[in-house]
Each structure stands twice: as structure tokens, then as C-alpha cells.
Amino acid sequence: MSADKVTLADLPLRDNLRGKSPYGAPQLQVPVRLNTNENPHPPSKALVDDVAASVREAAAELHRYPDRDAVALRTDLAAYLTAATGVRLGVENLWAANGSNEILQQLLQAFGGPGRTAIGFVPSYSMHPIISDGTQTEWLQASRAEDFGLDIDVAVSAVTERKPDVVFVTSPNNPSGQSVPLDDLRRVLDAMQGGILIVDEAYGEFSSQPSAVALLDDYPAKLVVSRTMSKAFAFAGGRLGYLAAAPAVIDALLLVRLPYHLSVLTQAAARAALRHADDTLGSVKALIAERERVSAELTRMGYRVIPSDANFVLFGAFTDAPATWQRYLDAGVLIRDVGIPGHLRVTIGLAAENDAFLAAGAELAGTELQPSTSPVGAQ
């Protein structure tokens, strides 16, 4: 049998991976790309120059392994998160990896695995079940409210009855955008009988709610807060995620992480990006203002708009969401079909990109919407 004739069915793939689909946000060259929730504002010249100089300096050490524990980077992350949340954190509370997905993978390697379970409240981030499958952690799920927000009573009941080893709560939730109040997170934590709660705050810088980091001292053995530099930080190409937790959690991850997992170049570039945090995060207010403008315009056109606390908006209600996604693409606008019947998600871009999206939406509103569509939260 020639190599090009071999299929997955011919390979000794694990049974729990057969029939599954990989993560796949389309990467297409179109005029307007609003599908992966990146910060559309490019890095400043000062940041680019700092990254280039830092990487150049680090390159002189390419013949040596990097700092295995990334102490300097974690120290900088602790300083940033302390300033951002008002919660005093040290290097012992922070861990970093190649994007928050690697953070989540390491957490599941340490606290999930064969014979253990993880639960999420769907629809939510699609990588949570994929990472669970990859670590042979049984994936459980419970439903969200009609507006896709977290139904705290359902969540507490699910955690109490099913006793998962890992609980995922995304705040703000992707793809619906709602943040979870700290009091609701406390209810979930209080209901847990062992296990850990991972609060996924990938979009935390956009949120109107306080970070779950504020609860770490009260629940040191139960709570982990994961974050990323891929969204508000405009560092998606740099691939840097991190978490805040009790020092013992970091000790647990040391048992499963691969040695030297963060390259010397990644560490240098991320530290440079953190030095420009104030400048980069200055775009957050502008993106929030654009989010509100886009939401208001979609509502005016008759779309059902889910109120968002992130840098994206979930909207509908379409007769055939996949077909409507294609019509946006035909108009030169790439948005995201996240698999929720009747709904699509759009990333908030630059004003001109949002205008192009809205222009396409105005054309489609008369033909694509369900007759019963009524905007959520409309006055």
C-alpha cells in the first residue's frame, strides 16, 4: 500500500478519537477577516522594534536551551496581572505555555485522564472537548440558558450530581460573549466535591466583570484561571498563554510539561510585548465601542443579537446559518459558523471592516432571517 493510500481507518488510532473532527477555523484570504477574534489593531512600531531587538539578543543563545521554567517571563506576567486585577500575585502563582490551549492541555494531563471526567456548559469553547478527548478524559456537558448565558442553577446541579474532576467555565463565554459574576463562580466552587474549576478568561481584558483571580485565596485547591495574550494583547502570532493558581498547581504541571517547552525566542518576544501592555490595551476601549455600534446596527436591521462582553458578537436568527455564512463570504467578509443553529459569530474589527460587514448584513437581512426573529435585549 502506497503512503498516499493510507487513511485514518488504516491506522491504530485510539478508539475515542475515531470519527472526531479537528479544530478548524477557516484561514482564507478575503478582504475582511472577522472570524478568529484577534485584535485587529497591528502592533505599534515601538513594540515591533522592541520585539525585534529582544529576539535578536535572544538569538545569540540559540545554541543553549532556554530557561526551562521561564522565570523572568512569569515574573512579568505576575506583575501585569497584579496591576490588572488588584490581586497580589508572584512568580509562584503564574505558569506560561504556547497559547492557552497548551495551558489547558497540561491541566487535563495533570487533573484529567483515563477514568476521570471534565464538564463544560455548551455552547462554549470548542477546544475544551477536543483537549479532553486528547487526554482521554471523559467529556460531559450541560446546557446553557436560552440566550446562551450560564444558567447557574443548572451548572450547580450538574456539578453536584455528576461530580466531575474538571469543570470548565468560560468568562466571557466564547461564542456567546457573556461574563460570569464572581458570586456565580462561588456557587459552582462551593458545589464541587473535589476536582478543579478552570475559569477560561481568554477575553478577560474585555470583560465588565472582575477576574476570577480575586477568588484564588478563597479556593486555592479548586480554582485555576487561564488567560492568553492572543486576544486583547494582539499577540496571537506569538502564541503565549498563561494561568494563575496556587503554587501547588504549578508544581503539578511541572510533572507533565515537556522540558524547555517555551523557546528562548517566545520568551523574549512575550516579555517585550508585556512592556508595551498599556499602549496595546489602549485599543480595548475602541473595540468595545465598535462592538456596541455593531450590536446596535444589527439590532436595528432586525437581527437577534446576543449581548456581548467580549470582542465578538453572536447574532441570528438565520433560516440556514451555513448558507448565510457562505453569502457573507461571497461578499468578501469571513465570519464564523460556530455550529449553533440559526446563528453566526462576528469578530469586532477595525471600523472600516465593521462597516463592510454591516453593509453585507443589510443586504442579507431581508432574505436570510427566520420570520419570528426578535432581538434579545431589544428595548
UniProtKB/Swiss-Prot annotation:
MF terms (GO), sorted A to Z: histidinol-phosphate transaminase activity; pyridoxal phosphate binding
A GO BP term here is: L-histidine biosynthetic process
Annotated pathway: Amino-acid biosynthesis; L-histidine biosynthesis; L-histidine from 5-phospho-alpha-D-ribose 1-diphosphate: step 7/9
Q: Which cofactor does it need?
A: pyridoxal 5'-phosphate
Pfam hit, one: Aminotran_1_2
Recorded catalytic reaction(s): these are:
L-histidinol phosphate + 2-oxoglutarate = 3-(imidazol-4-yl)-2-oxopropyl phosphate + L-glutamate
**Which sequence positions carry the modification called N6-(pyridoxal phosphate)lysine?**
K231
The answer to whether UniProt assigns keyword Transferase to this entry is yes
EC assignment: the record states: 2.6.1.9
UniProt KW keywords? Amino-acid biosynthesis, Aminotransferase, Histidine biosynthesis, Pyridoxal phosphate, Transferase
Q: How does it assemble?
A: Homodimer.
UniProt-recorded name of the protein: Histidinol-phosphate aminotransferase
